[in-house]
Each structure stands twice: as C-alpha cells, then as structure tokens.
Amino acid sequence: LLIITACLALIGTVWAKEGYLVDKNTGCKYECLKLGDNDYCLRECKQQYGKGAGGYCYAFACWCTHLYEQAIVWPLPNKRCSGK
C-alpha cells in the first residue's frame, strides 16, 4: 500500500500541468524579455496559481510549471489575443 501511494504521488508530480500564463481579459500571453530564469515570470505564476507554481521565460512569454489540473493557461477557448 505504501509503494502504491508513493507511485501515485510521483505520477502526480511528473505529470503536473504546465502552460503559458494568460491574461483572462485579453487572451494574450504575459510577455517577457529575459529568457530562462526570470523573477517577473516566477512572481506572476506564483501570484496567479499559488506558491507551489514555478515560472520562467520561454519564447518571450511566461511559462508556468507545477500547476493544478484545472489551471487556465494559453490559449483560451473562444478568445484570441487581439493583434498578437
């Protein structure tokens, strides 16, 4: 039973949701300039998704990691970022 519980916890950690941080009003990704480790992205991901979230700059947009399964990430259905 202990081994099964440990395996389930590991699978949940490995398969945690990831995605681009999105502005729910505009449908646009949060932009960033400094690729890789980025304090701005980390702070914004934690603020929107909680203390357990991580974040960095990938392809000039904030990429959030360790999200809960229901977290809303880019792209939003039926909402396109105007002009981008």
From Swiss-Prot:
GO molecular function annotation: sodium channel inhibitor activity; toxin activity
Function (record text): Mammal beta-toxins bind voltage-independently at site-4 of sodium channels (Nav) and shift the activation voltage to more negative potentials. This toxin is active against mammals.
Name by which UniProt lists this protein: Beta-mammal toxin Cn2
Cell division is among the record's keywords: no
Family, similarity comment: Belongs to the long (4 C-C) scorpion toxin superfamily. Sodium channel inhibitor family. Beta subfamily.
Highest taxon listed in the record's lineage: Eukaryota
Modified-residue entries (Serine amide), positions: 82
UniProt KW keywords: Amidation, Disulfide bond, Ion channel impairing toxin, Neurotoxin, Secreted, Signal, Toxin, Voltage-gated sodium channel impairing toxin
Cysteines paired by S-S bonds: 28-81, 32-57, 41-62, 45-64
Gene Ontology CC entries for this record: extracellular region
Free-text note regarding domains: Has the structural arrangement of an alpha-helix connected to antiparallel beta-sheets by disulfide bonds (CS-alpha/beta).
Main subcellular location: secreted
Signal peptide (UniProt feature, chain positions): 1-16
Stretches assigned to the LCN-type CS-alpha/beta domain: 17-82
GO BP of this protein: defense response
InterPro entries associated with the record: LCN-type_CS_alpha_beta_dom, Scorpion_toxin-like, Scorpion_toxin-like_sf, Scorpion_toxinL, Scorpion_toxinL/defensin
Tissues of expression: Expressed by the venom gland.
Localization per Swiss-Prot or TrEMBL: Secreted
More details: Is neutralized by the single-chain antibody fragment 10FG2.
